[in-house]
């Protein structure tokens, strides 16, 4: 049995340009992240009769056609659009209202709208437990010898004497998919295809993020 998705979701792919601050109507500084969301286009539509669910596929970002595989080139040609570097699929109940090749602009959202932003966090490489998990480490004195940043016991001295799955240890930090939820769109600049979103977004400058309708406000 297929569960249908009965919620309208709007979404755009964009490039994170960085953070700045603007004034609100009360003259207070508001920290915002600027996202440039141009060249979004509908590349595929899905429906319950054929696919078992309703969804819209969005393409974003230019790419050299010579670098696109033949199957993907045919996929974009069927939609009547030029090849795009990034593609994302959004499940939404109103997918039938979209058209193949339709261009989507930042006017999809309005000031004050609540959104979730999905991105890839900054990669930090291999990190210890103090940086990665916020451990306190070991004391600086009182006999501590070259143990200052170590995690301490990982469970071998207790019962059962083994290390459980999920034990917080040193390892690769960052470069992971992350969703920041329930953010507010502060302003929309349709002329320059810019979204000003209050607060910080995951990822470095120049990274691609997905701005979509929030699930908490549904």
From Swiss-Prot:
Keywords: Ribonucleoprotein, Ribosomal protein, RNA-binding, rRNA-binding. Gene3D superfamilies: 3.30.160.810, Translation factors (2.40.30.10). Transmembrane segments: none annotated. One of its GO terms (biological process) is translation. One of its GO terms (cellular component) is cytosolic large ribosomal subunit. Residues 137-157 are annotated as: Disordered. The keyword Ribonucleoprotein applies. Pfam families: Ribosomal_L3. GO terms for molecular function: rRNA binding; structural constituent of ribosome. One of the primary rRNA binding proteins, it binds directly near the 3'-end of the 23S rRNA, where it nucleates assembly of the 50S subunit. Part of the 50S ribosomal subunit. Forms a cluster with proteins L14 and L19. Belongs to the universal ribosomal protein uL3 family. This is Large ribosomal subunit protein uL3. It comes from Kocuria rhizophila (strain ATCC 9341 / DSM 348 / NBRC 103217 / DC2201). The lineage of its organism: Bacteria, Bacillati, Actinomycetota, Actinomycetes, Micrococcales.
